[in-house]
Amino acid sequence: MSDVLAAIYRGDREEAARLAGGKELDVFEAAALGRTGRLEELLDADASLANAWADDGFQPLGLASFFGHVDAARLLVGRGAEVNSASRNAMKVMPLHSAAATRDADLRYAIAELLLEAGADPNARQQDDFTPVMAADQSGDTRLRELLLEHGASG
């Protein structure tokens, strides 16, 4: 894992931005930082990067979704990122699970809505059969819960 991604995972956005300065970001770093300009460059050069796998088992859409980058998620979906692809690790997280785990409620809702409209499964199950509705309930996000139910999630 790169130093940039490690800093992002630790929640140290300032350090991640410092480390990213002057560096040619890869698709995972660009997605996790929400750098849509860099994402566009990378996807223009190689469209398959929209569904590439990081060493930790995540794809760019999952990273953009988890870190609350609506524009990056929209770009990736528009470029063919798979909305129902589970991570290749023990968690089996899909982008909708990642969106449901975003800290900011408005970003969480916006990304979940984007993914659902693109065909994300509202009943997707990750590790231990955890669903997006369970994530909404856990965070007390009734607005997200209603959105999921409107798109066919089981209550």
Task: Give the location of each predicted region.
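Ankyrin-repeat boundary/"N-cap" motif
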Residues: 1-6, 22-29, 51-63, 86-101, ...
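Leucine-rich solenoid repeat scaffolds
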Residues: 4, 8-13, 128-155
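Repeat-mediated protein-protein interaction surfaces in helical alpha-solenoids
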Residues: 6-18, 35-44
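Conserved ankyrin/ankyrin-like repeat signature
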Residues: 15, 38, 71-72, 107-111, ...
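Conserved hydrophobic site in ankyrin repeats
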Residues: 18-20, 42, 76, 115, ...
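Ankyrin-repeat inter-repeat connecting loop/turn
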Residues: 49-50, 83-85, 122, 155
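Tandem repeat domain/solenoid detector
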Residues: 78, 82, 117-121, 150
